UniProtKB/Swiss-Prot annotation:
It catalyses: pseudouridine(1915) in 23S rRNA + S-adenosyl-L-methionine = N(3)-methylpseudouridine(1915) in 23S rRNA + S-adenosyl-L-homocysteine + H(+). Homodimer. Keywords: Cytoplasm, Methyltransferase, rRNA processing, S-adenosyl-L-methionine, Transferase. Disulfide bonds: none annotated. CDD domains: RlmH-like. S-adenosyl-L-methionine binds at residues 70, 102, 121-126. It comes from Dictyoglomus thermophilum (strain ATCC 35947 / DSM 3960 / H-6-12). Its EC number is 2.1.1.177. It is found in: Cytoplasm. InterPro entries: Alpha/beta_knot_MTases, RlmH-like, tRNA_m1G_MTases_N. This is Ribosomal RNA large subunit methyltransferase H.
Length: 153
Protein backbone atom coordinates (compact mmCIF):
# COMPACT_ATOMS: atom_id res chain seq x y z
CA UNK A 1 0.00 0.00 0.00
CA UNK A 2 1.24 3.47 -0.89
CA UNK A 3 0.14 6.45 1.17
CA UNK A 4 1.01 10.09 0.64
CA UNK A 5 0.01 12.75 3.15
CA UNK A 6 -0.06 16.35 1.92
CA UNK A 7 0.17 18.85 4.77
CA UNK A 8 -0.10 22.62 4.50
CA UNK A 9 2.47 24.09 6.88
CA UNK A 10 5.37 22.67 8.84
CA UNK A 11 5.68 20.97 12.19
CA UNK A 12 7.00 23.43 14.75
CA UNK A 13 6.48 21.49 17.98
CA UNK A 14 9.26 19.05 18.85
CA UNK A 15 6.95 16.68 20.73
CA UNK A 16 4.75 16.36 17.64
CA UNK A 17 7.83 15.76 15.45
CA UNK A 18 8.82 12.97 17.83
CA UNK A 19 5.33 11.43 17.63
CA UNK A 20 5.24 11.67 13.83
CA UNK A 21 8.66 10.03 13.59
CA UNK A 22 7.59 7.26 15.98
CA UNK A 23 4.51 6.38 13.93
CA UNK A 24 6.44 6.55 10.66
CA UNK A 25 8.98 4.12 12.15
CA UNK A 26 6.13 1.74 13.08
CA UNK A 27 4.38 2.04 9.70
CA UNK A 28 7.27 1.93 7.23
CA UNK A 29 7.90 -1.84 7.48
CA UNK A 30 4.32 -2.42 6.26
CA UNK A 31 3.25 0.63 4.26
CA UNK A 32 5.10 2.86 1.82
CA UNK A 33 4.21 6.22 3.37
CA UNK A 34 5.53 9.70 2.71
CA UNK A 35 4.62 13.16 3.93
CA UNK A 36 4.83 16.24 1.74
CA UNK A 37 4.87 19.54 3.60
CA UNK A 38 3.67 22.41 1.42
CA UNK A 39 3.91 26.11 2.22
CA UNK A 40 1.21 27.85 4.20
CA UNK A 41 -0.15 31.22 3.18
CA UNK A 42 -1.73 31.96 6.56
CA UNK A 43 -0.38 35.52 6.55
CA UNK A 44 -2.75 36.33 3.66
CA UNK A 45 -6.50 36.78 3.77
CA UNK A 46 -8.52 33.57 4.02
CA UNK A 47 -9.77 33.78 0.43
CA UNK A 48 -6.32 34.34 -1.09
CA UNK A 49 -4.64 31.79 1.18
CA UNK A 50 -7.16 29.09 0.23
CA UNK A 51 -6.65 29.81 -3.48
CA UNK A 52 -2.85 29.68 -3.24
CA UNK A 53 -2.93 26.52 -1.13
CA UNK A 54 -5.44 24.97 -3.55
CA UNK A 55 -3.06 25.64 -6.43
CA UNK A 56 -0.08 23.95 -4.78
CA UNK A 57 -2.16 21.02 -3.53
CA UNK A 58 -3.55 20.39 -7.03
CA UNK A 59 -0.01 20.49 -8.47
CA UNK A 60 0.94 17.69 -6.07
CA UNK A 61 -1.93 15.37 -7.02
CA UNK A 62 -1.60 12.68 -9.68
CA UNK A 63 -4.15 10.78 -11.74
CA UNK A 64 -5.31 7.57 -10.12
CA UNK A 65 -4.81 8.67 -6.52
CA UNK A 66 -7.63 7.97 -4.09
CA UNK A 67 -7.94 11.31 -2.32
CA UNK A 68 -9.10 11.59 1.27
CA UNK A 69 -9.36 15.14 2.57
CA UNK A 70 -9.51 15.84 6.28
CA UNK A 71 -12.19 18.36 7.19
CA UNK A 72 -14.13 19.00 10.39
CA UNK A 73 -17.39 18.67 8.43
CA UNK A 74 -16.39 15.36 6.86
CA UNK A 75 -17.73 11.92 7.72
CA UNK A 76 -17.03 10.71 11.24
CA UNK A 77 -16.21 7.02 11.37
CA UNK A 78 -14.83 4.64 14.00
CA UNK A 79 -11.30 3.27 13.93
CA UNK A 80 -12.70 -0.09 12.84
CA UNK A 81 -14.64 1.51 9.97
CA UNK A 82 -11.54 3.48 8.97
CA UNK A 83 -9.51 0.27 8.88
CA UNK A 84 -12.09 -1.46 6.67
CA UNK A 85 -12.29 1.54 4.35
CA UNK A 86 -8.52 1.96 4.11
CA UNK A 87 -7.72 -1.66 3.37
CA UNK A 88 -10.66 -2.37 1.06
CA UNK A 89 -10.23 0.56 -1.29
CA UNK A 90 -10.26 -0.47 -4.95
CA UNK A 91 -6.71 0.63 -5.70
CA UNK A 92 -4.01 -1.20 -7.59
CA UNK A 93 -0.65 -2.00 -6.05
CA UNK A 94 0.97 0.86 -7.97
CA UNK A 95 -1.59 3.52 -7.09
CA UNK A 96 -1.84 5.34 -3.82
CA UNK A 97 -4.07 6.86 -1.22
CA UNK A 98 -3.47 10.56 -0.69
CA UNK A 99 -4.59 12.33 2.45
CA UNK A 100 -4.85 16.13 2.45
CA UNK A 101 -4.53 18.20 5.62
CA UNK A 102 -5.26 21.89 5.06
CA UNK A 103 -3.83 24.93 6.77
CA UNK A 104 -5.45 27.27 9.27
CA UNK A 105 -8.39 27.93 6.94
CA UNK A 106 -8.91 24.28 6.01
CA UNK A 107 -9.14 23.48 2.30
CA UNK A 108 -11.00 25.08 -0.59
CA UNK A 109 -14.29 23.78 -1.96
CA UNK A 110 -12.46 22.73 -5.13
CA UNK A 111 -10.17 20.46 -3.10
CA UNK A 112 -13.18 18.96 -1.32
CA UNK A 113 -14.90 18.38 -4.67
CA UNK A 114 -11.74 16.72 -6.03
CA UNK A 115 -11.74 14.28 -3.11
CA UNK A 116 -13.04 10.73 -3.16
CA UNK A 117 -13.84 10.90 0.54
CA UNK A 118 -13.95 13.64 3.18
CA UNK A 119 -12.98 12.44 6.64
CA UNK A 120 -13.44 14.15 9.97
CA UNK A 121 -11.14 13.15 12.80
CA UNK A 122 -13.47 14.80 15.32
CA UNK A 123 -16.09 17.48 15.75
CA UNK A 124 -13.29 19.46 17.36
CA UNK A 125 -10.80 21.48 15.35
CA UNK A 126 -7.10 20.55 15.46
CA UNK A 127 -3.98 22.27 14.19
CA UNK A 128 -2.47 20.72 11.07
CA UNK A 129 0.31 19.36 13.29
CA UNK A 130 -2.05 17.51 15.61
CA UNK A 131 -4.19 16.36 12.67
CA UNK A 132 -1.10 14.76 11.11
CA UNK A 133 -0.15 12.99 14.33
CA UNK A 134 -3.70 11.76 14.92
CA UNK A 135 -3.98 10.58 11.30
CA UNK A 136 -0.73 8.61 11.54
CA UNK A 137 -1.90 7.03 14.79
CA UNK A 138 -5.19 6.05 13.15
CA UNK A 139 -3.41 4.58 10.10
CA UNK A 140 -1.23 2.55 12.47
CA UNK A 141 -4.30 1.46 14.44
CA UNK A 142 -6.05 0.53 11.17
CA UNK A 143 -3.06 -1.61 10.20
CA UNK A 144 -3.15 -3.42 13.54
CA UNK A 145 -6.91 -3.99 13.21
CA UNK A 146 -6.50 -5.28 9.65
CA UNK A 147 -3.70 -7.64 10.73
CA UNK A 148 -5.77 -8.76 13.74
CA UNK A 149 -2.93 -7.78 16.07
CA UNK A 150 -3.22 -6.14 19.48
CA UNK A 151 -2.74 -2.40 19.43
CA UNK A 152 -1.84 -1.76 23.04
CA UNK A 153 1.56 -2.91 24.23
Amino acid sequence: MNIKIIVIGKIRNEFIKAGVNEYLKRLLPFINIKIEFLPSFSELSEKIALLKEEEIILKNLRNGEFIITLDKDGEKISSEEFSKKLFKLPISQNSQITFIIGGIYGVSEKIKQSSNFILSLSSMTFTHEFALLILLEQIYRALKIQRNEPYHY
